[in-house]
Design a protein with these regions (language model features):
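Conserved ABC ATPase "signature" region
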Residues: 76, 128-147, 256
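P-loop NTP-binding/switch modules centered on Walker-like glycine-rich loops
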Residues: 57, 178-182, 186-267
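Conserved ABC transporter NBD signature motif
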Residues: 65-76
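Short catalytic/signature loops enriched in Gly
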Residues: 4, 143, 239-344
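ABC ATPase NBD coupling module
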Residues: 77-94, 120, 242-247, 277-282
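A short, flexible loop at the N-terminus of ABC-type nucleotide-binding domains that lies
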Residues: 2-5, 14-27, 58-64, 80-84, ...
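A short, proline-enriched helix->beta-strand linker immediately N-terminal to the Walker B motif
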Residues: 171-175
Length: 348
């Protein structure tokens, strides 16, 4: 039986700005199982990074947690003091950020940047920390580790810098690794290498990963489960196969249709319109204004999470037994035929 290591319940986070309160996170519920990879996907501004940073308590000073809990190993992180969090960050929960150059101190040799984490959290001697740092660099694929520990970040390529950041994150064998778009700043070849490295290290360290990205192609390669976020909410969650091949929410349809595939015609689909202003979120389903299959109820009442399967849920009124049939995009029908087999039945 799987073991839940991290649980987010009814999380609501607002940001106080001169223009008013931005409702960035509007009731997020998520669970992370031990050893699994959960991908958070969605457009910019959907709440992916804010959700992840709230787990580390790394939100800016104008952030206000209005409601909810984040339970890690049976304790609510939101009730922890900054001193308590300093012993959790880097040791039990680690994070890899998008741009490796801004994650590393340009004035400090990379060896010291790795060893200071080990010395702080593991209470190791300098010699023990240096030995561990060498092992970590070799583990993440940096050759001549002993010599390269004496070099500065600018002496490494972008891909190598990201490997170093991963080495720092893994220095204390964390239970959870949060990877916030860790391959966005890298070219496609290096991106594939970093993803393969993360998969290998996950098996070796038996850690759970929250993988944040807007690239669905990346998700297919790394995730066990996927949570689709829109306007500060999770609108669909399921296994990677369920979300990719039997998607239920119109927003998930739009994301998948906008992915180039071998079946893509001359024009690539783009979701019409823009995400809503979270200073004043719309009533009902926030995606209704951009959806060509929106129902009348979408504009007045927010949909609950409907169960598609024991592992698959989606917040769309289209799943209500009373909902009318709506036309399903050709690309989604093609994916469902793969999921169910030709002629198989899926919800319309």
């Amino acid at each position: 039986m799987s073991e839940t290591i991290l649980s987010i319940e009814n999380l609501r986070i607002h940001f106080e700005t001169f223009a008013g309160e931005v409702q960035a996170i509007r009731g997020v519920n998520l669970k992370l199982e031990k050893g699994e990879t959960l991908a958070l996907v969605g457009e910019s501004g959907s709440g992916k990074s804010v959700t992840a940073k709230s787990v580390m308590k790394l939100l800016s000073n104008n952030a206000v947690v209005k409601e909810g809990s984040i339970t890690f190993k049976g304790e609510n992180i939101l009730e922890k003091s900054e001193r308590d969090m300093q012993s959790i960050r880097g040791k039990e929960i680690a994070m890899v950020f998008q741009d490796p150059m801004t994650s590393l101190d340009p004035t400090m040799k990379i060896g010291k940047q790795i060893t200071e984490v080990i010395i702080k959290h593991e209470k190791a001697s300098k010699e023990e920390a240096n030995k561990r740092a060498e092992e970590l660099l070799e583990l993440v694929g940096i050759p001549n580790a002993k010599e390269r520990m004496k070099q500065y970040p600018h002496q490494f390529s972008g891909g190598q810098r990201q490997r170093i950041v991963i080495a720092i994150a893994l220095a204390c064998n964390p239970d959870v690794l949060i990877a916030d778009e860790p391959t966005t700043a890298l070219d496609v070849t290096i991106q594939a290498q970093i993803l393969e490295l993360l998969k290998k290290l996950q098996q070796q360290f038996q850690m759970a990963i929250i993988f944040i990205t807007h690239d669905l192609g990346v998700v297919a390669n790394v995730a066990d489960r996927v949570a689709v976020m829109y306007a500060g909410k999770v609108v669909e969650v399921g296994t990677v196969d369920e979300v990719f091949y039997n998607p239920q929410h119109p927003y998930t349809w739009g994301l998948l249709r906008s992915m180039p595939t071998l079946h893509t015609g001359d024009t690539l689909y783009a979701i019409p319109g823009s995400p809503p202003d979270l200073l004043d979120p719309p009533v009902g389903d926030a995606f209704a204004l951009r959806s060509d299959v929106a129902l009348e109820i979408d504009r007045v009442k927010e949909p609950p999470m409907f169960e598609v399967s024991p592992t698959h849920f989606a917040a769309t009124w289209l799943l209500d037994p009373r909902a009318p049939k709506v036309p399903v995009p050709e690309e989604i029908v093609r994916r469902r035929n793969i999921f169910f087999g030709e002629g198989g039945q899926a919800h319309d």
